[in-house]
Amino acid sequence: MDQDWSRWLDEVPEEGESSGRAARSKAPVVRLRKRRGDSGEDAPAQRPILVVGGCGGAGTTTTALGIAGEIGAAGSQTVAVDATFAGSDLALRGADEHLSPISLQSWLYGRGDDEAAPLKECLSLATSGIGLLWRDPAPLRRRATYLTVSRAIDEAGYTPVYDGGSPIAGRHLRPLLEDADIALVLAIPARADAANRLRVTLEWLDDQFGGQGDGQGGGIVGDTTIVISHQLPGNDSRIADHLREHLDGWVREINEIPYDPHLARGELVRHSNLAAETRRAYRRLLAGVAS
């Protein structure tokens, strides 16, 4: 990949500086996942989504919950999946209706002989209508990977939204990153230092998963959506505008999630209690990565 795109990292937006939203060319959708409908014909389905952090404190869990909540609100069977290395607080933050004692591992091996138990019976639940799968610290066994998890969820008829946490380079995430059906959302907090670390992350993605012929807006980098999460009051968009100016055409899209007092509490998230502006931001994000 031509490295000219990374020169912006030597610059820092000045106080009061704000570039307008440039017209952006979108990277093509890589593939459409098919799901058999009531008519018996295959129809395009919502793409699975993997949310990972460009650094710690990026808001991957709340972003995954917000996206999943909006997919669920549209009527799709959706499950938010803990795809971190040793377990996160995904279910503790999102299961405002029912917290199941069944972990991802218990579901995955529930019937023995490498056959998963019925997914619906094992899910934690949110009042938004989505299910949640939390994982315990134990490693996946019997050579299972998150590709195994992905296939089992797809067979159950659910759309997964994975909370991958950080760092993105974790080996357990590779099967999901290698699957071009899965849309990648890269989240960072609205801080200059977090924006500057994107260079390392995007270069790593290109080195590990990019193709030799990938040009501007192509490959995994071109199919990546960057999300800037505002975790302090205010609507300062200088970081987002700066990234749009310098990454225009290189990534799929750059979106912002506004500050929301309900999310800032760090407690149980009830989707219906999110501000209208926050939910609109999740819908815009979802529209950008949807099939």
Model-derived features: positions:
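Extreme N-terminal, non-catalytic leader segments
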Residues: 1-56, 99, 109
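Walker A/P-loop phosphate-binding motif and the immediately C-terminal alpha-helix
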Residues: 43-93
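Conserved beta-strand segments of the P-loop GTPase G domain that flank and frequently precede/overlap
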Residues: 51-52, 81, 133-136, 161-164, ...
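Phosphate-binding loop that captures ATP/GTP phosphates
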Residues: 74-130
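Inter-motif core of Ras-like GTPase G domains
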Residues: 171-192
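Intrinsically disordered, low-complexity terminal tails and inter-domain linkers enriched
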Residues: 211-218
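Beta-strand-loop-alpha "switch" segments that mediate conformational coupling across diverse proteins
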Residues: 229-275
